A protein has these predicted regions:
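N-proximal low-complexity "stem/linker" segments adjacent to membrane-targeting elements
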Residues: 1-30
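Short loop->beta transition adjacent to catalytic acidic/histidine clusters or analogous donor-positioning motifs
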Residues: 5-8, 29-40, 48, 60-64
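Acidic helix N-cap motif at the loop->helix transition within catalytic regions
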Residues: 19-22, 47-55
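A conserved acidic beta->alpha catalytic loop
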Residues: 27, 34, 42-51, 70-72, ...
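Short aromatic/hydrophobic "clamp" motif used to bind/position activated sugar donors
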Residues: 90
Length: 97
């Protein structure tokens, strides 16, 4: 598939999804369209979600992790990631989908 359609910013809000987030990231990496950035916005997880995401980010610079200053809920978490988005297109993908 051609990548001429522009950058897609995939926003993934997360909270305590260490058990699911790796599969979510792998599903994005497996897409045929490769012009994307993944913005994982953590709502102050208490598990090792951060470590899982950062492990992927070490080998794929399209993956970016950020954590809220405090637990804020899904809407604020999505909006925080949206502020960082660089893409022409925005897609939302929950971390447990």
């Amino acid at each position: 598939m051609t990548n001429d359609y522009g950058l897609v910013s995939i926003i993934t809000p997360t909270w305590a999804c260490a058990g699911f987030i790796a599969e979510t990231i792998r599903s994005i990496q497996a897409q045929t369209y490769t012009n994307w950035e993944l913005l994982v916005q953590d709502d102050c997880s208490t598990d090792n979600t951060k470590e899982v995401v950062e492990l992927f980010a070490q080998s794929d610079n399209r993956i970016k992790y950020e954590c809220n200053d405090r637990n804020s809920g899904a809407a604020i978490t999505r909006n925080n990631a949206l502020k960082r988005a660089q893409g022409r297109w925005i897609a939302f993908l929950d971390s447990d989908d």
